[in-house]
């Protein structure tokens, strides 16, 4: 929860303890995903190389256990880690894989997050396909609204706002960013509002 709220410093000790407990208590079922999430937290904390190595390790462990049903969230973590590291094509490929796996096993929440990652990895390309990226965001948003995933709803509106802002579509960008800001504030997610406010200011300055 802390990680999705953007509070990496509070998330890290919780995740490190979870991995330690899985190892010391010999709980292999949950270890791969906990390792992957911890790696993502390290990447968010700026420890790119160490974090990527951990996420990749978590995915490899999950693959080795042959539990494809549990693979989608680990693959999504890897996609997000690659995204943060600027490895956009790898992020896009892994996001597509996570979407397919989540759809196959009817994991709609995982599918929603993976669709958002498809939007992000498409939108951040040097010459993004705007409508393709927007379509991924809107698919993710529709699922997030249906499932009550409000943090993801906010992320989708933020992604759309940034995408439209870079494309010169000021009115649409302003509407999406304003919605994102309202959602983040209503959930007291303090990490993102400054980013949204900066994006809004940039849109107004264009």
Task: Describe the role of every protein-language-model region.
Residues 1-206:
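Helix-coil-helix junctions within alpha-helical repeat/solenoid scaffolds
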């Amino acid at each position: 929860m802390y990680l999705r709220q953007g509070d990496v410093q509070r998330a890290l000790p919780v995740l490190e303890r979870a991995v330690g407990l899985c190892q010391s208590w010999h709980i292999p079922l949950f270890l791969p995903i906990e390792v992957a999430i911890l790696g993502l937290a390290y990447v968010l904390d700026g420890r790119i190389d160490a974090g990527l190595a951990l996420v990749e390790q978590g995915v490899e462990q999950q693959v080795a256990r042959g539990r494809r049903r549990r693979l989608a969230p680990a693959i999504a973590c890897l996609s997000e880690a690659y995204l943060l590291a600027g490895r956009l094509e790898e992020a896009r490929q892994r996001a597509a894989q996570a979407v397919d796996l989540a759809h196959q096993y009817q994991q709609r929440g995982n599918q929603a997050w993976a669709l958002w990652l498809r939007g992000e990895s498409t939108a951040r390309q040097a010459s993004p396909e705007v409508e393709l990226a927007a379509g991924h965001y809107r698919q993710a948003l529709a699922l997030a609204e249906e499932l009550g995933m409000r943090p993801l709803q906010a992320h989708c509106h933020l992604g759309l706002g940034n995408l439209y802002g870079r494309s010169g579509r000021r009115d649409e960008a302003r509407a999406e960013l304003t919605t994102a800001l309202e959602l983040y504030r209503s959930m007291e997610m303090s990490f993102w509002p400054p980013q949204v406010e900066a994006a809004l200011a940039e849109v107004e300055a264009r």
